[in-house]
Amino acid sequence: MVVGDFAIETETLVVGAGPGGYVAAIRAAQLGQKVTIVEKGNLGGVCLNVGCIPSKALISASHRYEQAKHSEEMGIKAENVTIDFAKVQEWKASVVKKLTGGVEGLLKGNKVEIVKGEAYFVDANTVRVVNGDSAQTYTFKNAIIATGSRPIELPNFKFSNRILDSTGALNLGEVPKSLVVIGGGYIGIELGTAYANFGTKVTILEGAGEILSGFEKQMAAIIKKRLKKKGVEVVTNALAKGAEEREDGVTVTYEANGETKTIDADYVLVTVGRRPNTDELGLEQIGIKMTNRGLIEVDQQCRTSVPNIFAIGDIVPGPALAHKASYEGKVAAEAIAGHPSAVDYVAIPAVVFSDPECASVGYFEQQAKDEGIDVIAAKFPFAANGRALALNDTDGFLKLVVRKEDGVIIGAQIIGPNASDMIAELGLAIEAGMTAEDIALTIHAHPTLGEIAMEAAEVALGTPIHIITK
């Protein structure tokens, strides 16, 4: 503590007000703790401000534009459809503002003290919060670190006006004529799809042999087919070597199939992963155990090697997902309050807002087989569903991974319209230990996309009505 300084006492101090931190703070307050939350940026973190929410708003706007231009098959002919991109950005910002304002209201409504600034650990019960020229010391009984992550910057692709991270791509002032996306993971696919919908010529360079390596190849193939239809070029096994930036664009050099090639574009978007924000917290002062990737090691209650300090979200091992961070935030807050809460990741869903959307929860078929689990893989296509046909959006399928010995659902994958919403039912099924018969016997409204889960369950039972499997 600085000589002459006074410390403000709190019971639980949360560092970071993203989807993990603010949820942890609210849950801790609900459990009767005096809570202080420290945030150096805007409330809501990356997710609400420059991630999940604005990207989905941009994607939604791009789909509206594409549908307006390409609905001739349904008898809708629209000529001279234009984009007011400044208005798109204004609308996107309004969505963000509503949600961040909502977070502030929730924190204040739960009597959580909000402190602006950067927190540095002095010891296991003290942080120093710096905000510009001012600083304040806080002491705490327990702390929850929820500082999130930031985009990885490649050595030969330093972020600039033309070489963008995801934040830069979300905040462009124009629809670019051309865009090179380095990285075919979920961020690259989502933003590449959005700009392709707006009319941008998009090229995706992926270093691996397939895009969306965390999903099944058949799912990736469907997305690639749709991307090709939009005019997107996907180059796999491509190694991005460097970029030459000009005032009006950038030239990217890459290697593919043993050849060195170049491509010109207005902008380059680099989406090759994220780095945990753990390097500027002073964690070395308190001896918290870390992995060699800068992640904080935690137990099943999100407790670090320092017993009164917890960590959640992108800074701990596991997928960097907002809903995972929120879940861990609740667990950490409850653990501090003495509850026996512990994480269970068996039903954490993953979603890509691609076109069509794809989602997964629990086991993939091959993953289950690799672990020696005898499974039934039951698949039902969107093309056999009345609602999908009425939407004129029939690419994709729903697959259930069912344990053969007892019929319990242990995994599910969906690629198709509204997959992001449909996966929730199957996450519940896995969490509750439900069987394929449980889903098959549940009456699903007709005509809906949700019926596809029931139909796939009937396939698993060998009693499908709307598909021939023999």
Swiss-Prot record:
UniProt keyword annotations, A-Z: Cytoplasm, Disulfide bond, FAD, Flavoprotein, NAD, Oxidoreductase, Redox-active center
Biological-process GO terms, alphabetical: 2-oxoglutarate metabolic process
NCBIfam families, alphabetized: lipoamide_DH
Positions of FAD binding: 39-47, 56, 119, 314, 322
Cofactor(s) needed: FAD
Subunit architecture: Homodimer. Identified in a complex with PdhC.
Entry's Gene Ontology cellular component terms: cytoplasm
This protein's name: Dihydrolipoyl dehydrogenase
